[in-house]
């Protein structure tokens, strides 16, 4: 199975759009300790810049998705990117932590469009294994972000200070606007658009809320993402402040998790075609819980080894490469007419889960790995229970691509 030239172009462009949100997180992670010092605030308050970003990132997807079902996919992308540019400029000029938190919220509100709408576009174009293949390819592009972004951020921070990160994000958003205008086609033609109706949106929400399979799959993937968000919020303080790494060394070890995620995601389509996506997800979530519980047990027993932490986190995030993409494909496959709304609602649930876990972890943060590993284990066990409650039955033969 190979992509056409147009499909390859769309995959690359959608992947770049989808990477904007993670890139806006990962580039400034190495600067969190220095931001706390520069703006004279605490670690917990500094982590609020992540929490508010994730909150807006999740909640605002619920706006972009339904609107894209009604007026097309491209107009909401223009609106979101404009908001992101405004928020990035505000962050670059932030005189205090309150200002930075507020404009990070605006940033998140803008970049929410780049999460909800690309997944809806994939559903416009494909279902089944072809959708899994395209989603995995996009996840590959997204996953390069954790390898490049911290290194890029470290270089900018060392050379020009942490504010330069937000200047670079502003430039990247303008490039994305150009790609949107010149390269991305409209995949929601007028004849397929839903009427602009609050009642229709309410009925669509009702349909999704009553679909236990949709909710279970979305939250399974969301709990996987939540463990990633907890790592994002805690890792720079643990690696730099606790273990004494430099920002550049932190970026390297941070990128190892992306390597595991990328490597496993490349096998998602092959494994789904052989075993079925449900069996793939159940197997991956079982190993996810297994490695997370081992990590928690060792940390709780007082094992303060950087090598052990890095190795087991690599295993945990390798499992997520086989969970996050396939669960979203399975969740959306029966909701084609509501693809934008379903993608947005699913994204909102996932981001809200991640934001809540960050807030919960920050309450117990000690600059050691224990609160982080406990939160990751909680996410993993919960995902395991949800996955087996949702998918613990015989799956039909693997679906052919459309």
Predicted regions and their residues:
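Juxtamembrane intracellular "pre-TM" segments in multi-pass secondary transporters
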Residues: 2-3, 187-218
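Cytoplasmic helix-loop-helix junction between adjacent transmembrane helices
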Residues: 103-144
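A late C-terminal transmembrane helix in Major Facilitator Superfamily
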Residues: 329-367, 376
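Paired small-residue
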Residues: 83-90, 98-106, 307-313
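Helix-loop-helix hairpin linking two adjacent transmembrane segments in secondary transporters
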Residues: 99, 137-182
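Conserved MFS/SLC helix-loop-helix module at the cytosolic interface between two early adjacent transmembrane helices
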Residues: 59-98
């Amino acid at each position: 199975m190979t992509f056409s030239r147009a499909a390859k172009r769309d995959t690359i462009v959608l992947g770049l759009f989808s990477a904007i949100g993670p890139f806006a997180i990962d580039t400034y992670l190495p600067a969190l300790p220095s931001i706390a010092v520069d703006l004279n605030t605490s670690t917990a308050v500094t982590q609020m810049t992540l929490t508010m970003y994730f909150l807006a990132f999740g909640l605002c997807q619920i706006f972009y998705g339904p609107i894209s079902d009604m007026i097309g996919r491209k107009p909401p992308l223009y609106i979101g990117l404009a908001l992101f540019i405004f928020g990035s400029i505000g962050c670059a000029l932030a005189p205090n932590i309150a200002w930075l938190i507020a404009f990070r919220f605006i940033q998140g509100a803008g970049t929410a469009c780049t999460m909800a709408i690309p997944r809806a576009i994939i559903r416009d174009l494909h279902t089944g294994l072809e959708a899994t293949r395209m989603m995995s390819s996009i996840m590959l592009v997204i996953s390069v972000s954790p390898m490049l972004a911290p290194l890029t951020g470290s270089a900018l921070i060392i050379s020009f200070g942490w504010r330069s990160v937000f200047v670079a994000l502003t430039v990247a958003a303008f490039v994305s606007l150009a790609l949107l205008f010149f390269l991305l086609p409209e995949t929601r033609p007028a004849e397929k658009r839903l009427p602009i109706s609050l009642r229709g949106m309410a009925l669509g929400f009702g349909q999704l809320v009553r679909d236990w399979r949709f909710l279970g799959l979305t939250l399974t993937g969301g709990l996987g993402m939540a463990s990633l968000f907890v790592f994002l919020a805690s890792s720079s303080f643990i690696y730099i402040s606790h273990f004494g790494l430099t920002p550049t060394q932190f970026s390297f070890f941070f990128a190892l998790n992306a390597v595991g995620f990328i490597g496993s995601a490349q096998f998602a389509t092959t494994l789904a075609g052989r075993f079925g996506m449900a069996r793939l997800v159940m197997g991956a979530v079982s190993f996810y819980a297994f490695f997370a519980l081992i990590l928690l047990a060792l940390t709780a027993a007082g094992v303060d080894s950087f090598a052990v932490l890095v190795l087991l986190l690599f295993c945990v995030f390798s499992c997520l490469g086989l969970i996050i993409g396939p669960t979203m494909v399975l969740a959306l496959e029966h909701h084609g007419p509501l693809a934008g709304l379903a993608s947005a609602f699913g994204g909102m649930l996932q981001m809200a889960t991640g934001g809540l876990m960050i807030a919960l972890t920050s309450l117990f943060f000690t600059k050691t790995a224990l609160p982080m590993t406990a939160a990751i284990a909680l996410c993993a066990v919960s995902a395991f229970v949800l996955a087996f409650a949702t998918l613990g039955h015989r799956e039909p033969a693997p679906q052919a691509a459309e």
